[in-house]
Amino acid sequence: MYQSLMTVRETQIAIKEVKTFFEDQLAKRLELFRVSAPLFVTKKSGLNDHLNGVERPIEFDMLHSGEELEIVHSLAKWKRFALHEYGYEAGEGLYTNMNAIRRDEELDATHSIYVDQWDWEKIVQKEWRTVDYLQKTVLTIYGIFKDLEDHLFEKYPFLGKYLPEEIVFVTSQELEDKYPELTPKDREHAIAKEHGAVFIIGIGDALRSGEKHDGRAADYDDWKLNGDILFWHPVLQSSFELSSMGIRVDSKSLDEQLTKTGEDYKREYDFHKGILEDVLPLTIGGGIGQSRMCMYFLRKAHIGEVQSSVWPDDLREACKKENIHLF
């Protein structure tokens, strides 16, 4: 039976260690400045992240003006707008301590309706919009993960070290070609188990089979220049996503992707006009799950062991029977 390597109190102390180390290194190595983040945005702005395009945001109206607001799913689009508003230049970027509510999330060991992540965004020049630049950025972030594991090992040697020396890059099409008989999720399990750490490139568009590896909203990532960082989780014995990131859409790719998804109405939103008219800067960015990080590096079996959220009674009981104590 599962046995946590730390008490609840020890876990809380270690969570701070994980978050503080990673935040400091992320800011330093990607040259990012921390900014204040909104909990909600106006509906008409189009700044909310609509994830896979089907999840419902929490909506409410403001007494003073009656304006409709949405609690954020993530700050994928807001960050790009903020870079423009704050006058950042190519090579400069920002990050936020993002908190969100995703009401339609299917709850399991790795998913909660409460989301906390380091949301970051950086301005790039047109010639930087390449797979090579994407991979270079992934390698920088992976280097932070490696150093974090080493740092924790010095303080908590019983946590062990599992990350390989290098992260492997693979496209979603190469995965389909390698494992045509498997579902996309099972392909992720197979490749993560084989290599320990992988970055899957190109998520959102249809593969040669006609199926997508996974859904992505049409209006933030360029589907050819994005991807997910996956590790093999030693406790769960499955693939484990730490980050979704990518080079963002330019006017050409946004035009193409909105047409593919049948979302031409979004062209009227302020954010989308800003991209289509080349007003907003070209960027790269992503979200790095804070609870996911803590869950992986502290070797936890459930995300509820590293964050406070709401769980159904039957799920709490099931966890208790497996010796999993949720916050």
From Swiss-Prot:
Belongs to the class-II aminoacyl-tRNA synthetase family. AsnA subfamily. GO terms for cellular component: cytosol. GO terms for molecular function: aspartate-ammonia ligase activity; ATP binding; catalytic activity, acting on a protein; transferase activity. InterPro entries: aa-tRNA-synth_II, aa-tRNA-synth_II/BPL/LPL, AsnA. Keywords: Amino-acid biosynthesis, Asparagine biosynthesis, ATP-binding, Cytoplasm, Ligase, Nucleotide-binding. Transmembrane segments: none annotated. Signal peptide: none annotated. Its EC number is 6.3.1.1. It is found in: Cytoplasm. It catalyses: L-aspartate + NH4(+) + ATP = L-asparagine + AMP + diphosphate + H(+). One of its GO terms (biological process) is L-asparagine biosynthetic process. This is Aspartate--ammonia ligase. It comes from Bacillus cereus (strain AH187). HAMAP family: AsnA. Pathway: Amino-acid biosynthesis; L-asparagine biosynthesis; L-asparagine from L-aspartate (ammonia route): step 1/1.
